[in-house]
């Protein structure tokens, strides 16, 4: 879908800069080159790969803003920057023992950061993992670190957070009669509890994409330990 979006934007006479987020958790830890090569096949003067970052940085969901900022800096300010191409950067990272999930954010030579009136499309459809990064650009009251406020258009593949003012390309159909809803309608009580890292799974996702607790639903959030990785 990223390639399709890039082609659509190019057809509208737009310059396209792709910001790659490497996975390494839901797939093999060192398979990013497979997908990057697919992107490179469509790259030309109008479509370029601008930055790279492992999901450890770009897809944090536990308020570790120091990580998010590293990815944001690469996207917004092209800092830091490397003179090598993306595949060389990836190989050098592997050679140093850093694999896809933890790829250190960097921009590439031909990218010079965001400019006034640029637009951003968030192509990730994993809502809980993109709330923090999207809020950096869209939330005018964001205060965790200095950001930029002059992005002309913002859009997401799906709704990440209904409180974040971003256009949604593909709104979700809300499921009905979820387990939490049935329990609540039966007049029973329920408890949803998890660590911060998985809190969205037992609340937002479990309740069919609804943020607010059901009637007689209690939620308990246990702060996840502040560690680099849970391995």
Spans of features found by a protein language model:
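Feature captures the catalytic ectodomains and active-site-proximal regions of enzymes
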Residues: 1-231
